[in-house]
Amino acid sequence: RKAWHILNRMENVGGDLNAYTNKEETVVYSAFLTEHLERALELLGDIVFHSTFPQHEIEKETEVIIDEIQSYEDNPSELIFDDFEDMIFRNHPLGRNILGKPELLRSFRTEDVLSFTRRYYQPGNMVFFVQGQYDFKKIIRLAEKYLSDIPAAEVNNHRVPPPLYVPEHLTIAKDTHQAHVMIGSRGYNAYDDKRTALYLLNNVLGGPGMNSKLNVALRERRGLVYNVESNLTSYTDTGAFCIYFGTDVEDMDTCLKLTYKELKRMRDTKMTSSQLAAAKKQLIGQIGVASDNFENNALGMAKTYLH
């Protein structure tokens, strides 16, 4: 079947069929009405395990991705995140940006893509996750019908650990109105017991709440930035912590001083029991609201099962 035929089969019943990649997973997913479960599973199985990747389709999609790369490179507030991970994971796969380079994309042939999918798209390397009002026995029956012909093979997902972290400072000159700044370091991996505590501290420091310490210090009190945030990313074997803000060039040094001041205060000042309780309450509330989104909920649980 042509790609359009597959997409149209889902669109015709108001469903959504999509995919995305990050640095450790590829996700193919669908959202649909309960009555279209079998149609969705049949299409997903066909896409993941039976795609043929004709060369003309690869070449067409390559140009789409190159357009995306060019658009991305025009946005320094996004590009800086890739530059940051390239620095802290220097000469390591985690330091490479997900979209890749145009010259590499144009070199791909059908057999390259098929070889990759045969190697990694294996039952032992995947999870199949369904969320909704379904009978479990029906799910098993349909999975056996559409997914049972997949040959199993041993998959080695081991990668070389990132090299020892060496602090760096990088300045990239660009003709923009704003200075885009990122400060960060390595963080905890997804299995580290200290990760949850760091997520809580990160939320207090520069999480999505308007009352985060950095947002109050840089935006609410002084109006120096439009956006300031801190982020913690946990991979299976390492992690990354970063603070980002965009500001006028003349305000950059002031913002840096204020940021370091908040970091020092957080390091040196113990949270009171009431502050800790409030921080936990806020994070629990944010998790609860995010869980109301079925897509976030399903993808989050599937990732938990995978790792």
Say what each PLM segment does.
Residues 5-161, 171-172, 176, 181, ...:
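Charge-rich, well-structured scaffold segments of protease-associated domains
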Residues 167-168:
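Flexible, small-/acidic-enriched active-site or ligand-binding loops
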Residues 194-196:
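Short glycine/proline-enriched turns and hinge-like loops at secondary-structure junctions
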